[in-house]
């Protein structure tokens, strides 16, 4: 009956617990074997997880490489990187030229000369003024700044900065007075250049100014950057960056001086791809070798894994024909030859064979990855079936154990009853013997 409890040796007639343990140990051997098999599969799946990541990395590397874009990539070499920096797009022509930086851009900085006696001094009156900022000689933006009699210089600075982003206000201390300082936030915001006498400037304060402001004094002139390419006209920019001065070429001025510029085809993306491919290929091939070769290899003779190596090696023929790849004794590969020379001397052949390699490698990597994922799924299915078998066997074992307990308990009861009968018979025989002995007297 379900739920019944049986205890060994309750009557003392038969201690069947150890016998039951031995029987159950024998009956549980199939479960132990299944558990060992499941453990082995889990170990294989862990190893395959690491290998799968390498296959995925190789597959993504090949699929994400764009040969057309890489062949169009240009680079700019400069003779003096302290003078300029140059960025180029694929539209840039392959030319050389000189750049003369006449001057770099600078921001306009003004200080109002009256000043506050302390940071706690208040303005003492209510009013407002207008901050006007010229973005060009004819165009400007305006902002109204209101102030009250209890405002300090710090309050005015905060109001100016919170109202707009063209001018940065701050406090200038000359050792005696605290003064308002105004500076452009960026050279690129305005093409206005400051005149030494301030007859032309970008920053203006108009209206009723606090008497502590005074007159503005020039600290630094706003200047536009100027460069000359070769013997051409001087080019001017509000900031230090000159966009598309030549199609696809942008120049950033750093300081006055001259630098040579040479624009040429950039092979770095192709070289980087080939280096990464060789590294990834060698990692995959080396792991295939360790997984499938040797007496204790976990996947010895497993075709799914061995085919990964064979499939990838078949894709290398175009690269070997270009002289860019060579085999090493251990089955790995390395780069050989001069990439730049191959591309420059045989551009059409290089593009054709690289395309052939990429197409075949992409197809093989995809097939290998999918086959490998199927193999992992097969092992996972095996593990799930083992789990189900273990569950069923465990249930059956519990039932069999309960049956054996009941049978042993019944046997113990029977043996206890038999012992009791034997004792009674023994006592009965003793009594008869005693009776017979007494009669003989």
Swiss-Prot record:
Belongs to the FliD family. InterPro entries: Flagellin_hook_IN_motif, FliD, FliD_C, FliD_N. Homopentamer. GO terms for cellular component: bacterial-type flagellum filament cap; bacterial-type flagellum hook; extracellular region. It holds the Pfam family FliD_N. This is Flagellar hook-associated protein 2. One of its GO terms (biological process) is bacterial-type flagellum-dependent cell motility. It comes from Aquifex aeolicus (strain VF5). Required for the morphogenesis and for the elongation of the flagellar filament by facilitating polymerization of the flagellin monomers at the tip of growing filament. Forms a capping structure, which prevents flagellin subunits (transported through the central channel of the flagellum) from leaking out without polymerization at the distal end. Residues 376-416 form a coiled coil. It comes from the Bacteria. The keyword Transmembrane does not apply. It is found in: Secreted; Bacterial flagellum. Keywords: Bacterial flagellum, Coiled coil, Secreted.
